[in-house]
């Protein structure tokens, strides 16, 4: 059988210390954003995202509260698989917005499960190499950019 | 350096850790590192260095050309990919391959590269690929990469297809990662640091070619008390760090159809020895074949150790020079 889940040693750049930021409007807190880096050696099409699950402080974040931003465009997680003309370059972060009304200041335990399809590594019809881009980290909420 | 018609180049993939992990490290920095090693020919991998892929923005191509010109270096080859799995749930067909090949040929041409590296082109599309290579004036090399080996049936079938088609545009790029005889110590150290049991790692290495599949090996190691750290090691040893007796006979069958080489390496000691890849045997086969062209050093130790790419590349270039000078003399003596 082929290599199943590849995990490269760039995990530290998936959730950087300053990745978690509050997202406020003049009307008040709207939610927060989270920047996600690639743990791979090259960029990938956005459609390579096979699954993206976010858990903050042990609470899974509901899918309908999440929007993903890349190249100035927003996608619900359910549409990422269709975004095959968007390229996620290796030096650029994916930004996730969570519209939950905000979270408290201070540290938060962030667990990201992100599986990517290795789009050039096909082992059999419908069977592709997979990249484990998951990471866990305690992140302190930062102010807005 | 050029030794009797074999020129040393460097794949910028060698600086992958720097490029990926250092926010301020740019293509210009990679080219500076290349120049510091006194090397002029290089390979650029589009999906690493460009923000847009499969087709880079024209300004990105312009930037590479300008940075190269000012440093007196040349993009010799362009590293392309067949990203045919980009459409989720779609079984790729000829159109998907042709799209990616065309995109990469266009970029290679714009960069002035003589060669395009491709990861895979189905055999029935090779005649069309040769035609497209003529249109764009760029030669296409299919990389022979671990876990494949030159003697593998699908590689030999490609070789037969190249012969049948008869176009000089088509050839191979053998990657020396195919000839890993044993994982390098730093690769093992990384797994041990992650919690893998050294004895279980030795068991995996000793039984890698016992006929067990990756899943069966995983199952057995679990029964022996192994966990996640061993699973990651197994995935690596059955994948890109696949190892075994070097397929030198298979290697020689490809040499007449080789465009250039990816002189892949993971670790060169201070004494200028590569404990993983049989460099003297590989390079002397190349010299004996009469090959004239580029030997592209490609450091991949960054996959498992903190990188010192410039130091490792400097050692690797010297190691190649030593072997090539010796092999060239031997070859001359044998040819008399």
Per-range role (PLM):
Chain A
Residues 1-145:
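Terminal leader/tail segments of proteins
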């Amino acid at each position: 059988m082929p290599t199943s889940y590849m995990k490269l040693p760039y995990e530290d750049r998936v959730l950087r210390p300053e990745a978690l930021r509050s997202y406020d409007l003049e009307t008040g807190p709207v939610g927060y954003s989270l920047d996600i880096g690639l743990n791979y050696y090259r960029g990938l099409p956005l459609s390579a995202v096979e699954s993206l699950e976010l858990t903050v402080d042990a609470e899974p974040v509901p899918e309908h509260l999440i929007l993903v931003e890349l190249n100035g465009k927003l996608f619900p997680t359910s549409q990422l698989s269709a975004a095959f003309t968007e390229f996620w370059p290796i030096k650029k972060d994916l930004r996730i917005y969570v519209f939950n009304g905000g979270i408290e200041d201070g540290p938060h335990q962030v667990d990201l499960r992100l599986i990517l399809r290795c789009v050039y590594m096909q082992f059999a019809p419908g069977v592709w190499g997979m990249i484990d881009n998951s990471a866990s980290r305690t992140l302190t909420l930062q102010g807005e950019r | 350096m050029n030794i009797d018609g074999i020129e040393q180049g460097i794949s910028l993939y060698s600086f992958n850790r720097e490029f990926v992990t250092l926010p301020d490290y740019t293509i210009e920095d990679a080219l500076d590192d290349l120049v510091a090693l006194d090397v002029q020919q290089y390979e650029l991998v589009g999906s690493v260095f460009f923000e847009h892929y499969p087709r880079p923005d024209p300004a990105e191509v312009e930037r590479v050309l300008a940075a190269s010109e000012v440093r007196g270096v040349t993009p010799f080859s362009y590293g392309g990919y067949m990203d045919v799995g980009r459409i989720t749930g779609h079984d790729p067909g000829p159109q998907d391959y042709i799209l990616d090949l065309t995109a990469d040929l266009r970029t290679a041409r714009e960069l002035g590269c003589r060669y395009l590296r491709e990861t895979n082109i189905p055999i029935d599309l090779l005649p069309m690929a040769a035609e497209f290579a003529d249109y764009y004036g760029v030669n296409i090399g299919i990389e022979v990469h671990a876990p494949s080996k030159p003697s593998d049936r699908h590689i030999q079938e490609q070789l037969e297809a190249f012969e049948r088609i008869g176009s000089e545009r088509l050839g191979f790029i053998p990657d020396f990662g195919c000839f890993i005889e044993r994982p390098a110590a730093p690769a093992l150290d990384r797994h041990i640091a992650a919690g893998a049991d050294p004895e279980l790692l030795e068991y995996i290495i000793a039984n890698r070619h016992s006929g067990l599949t990756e899943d069966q090996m995983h199952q057995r190691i679990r029964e022996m008390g192994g966990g996640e750290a061993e699973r990651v090691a197994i995935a690596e040893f059955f994948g890109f760090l696949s190892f075994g007796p070097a397929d030198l006979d298979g290697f020689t069958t490809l040499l007449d159809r080789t465009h250039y080489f990816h002189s892949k390496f993971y670790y060169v000691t201070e004494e200028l020895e590569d404990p993983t890849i049989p460099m003297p045997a590989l390079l002397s086969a190349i010299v004996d074949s009469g090959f004239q062209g580029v030997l592209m050093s490609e450091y991949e130790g960054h996959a498992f150790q903190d990188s010192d790419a410039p130091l490792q590349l400097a050692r690797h270039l010297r190691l190649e020079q030593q072997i090539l000078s010796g092999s060239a003399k031997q070859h001359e003596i044998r040819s008399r």
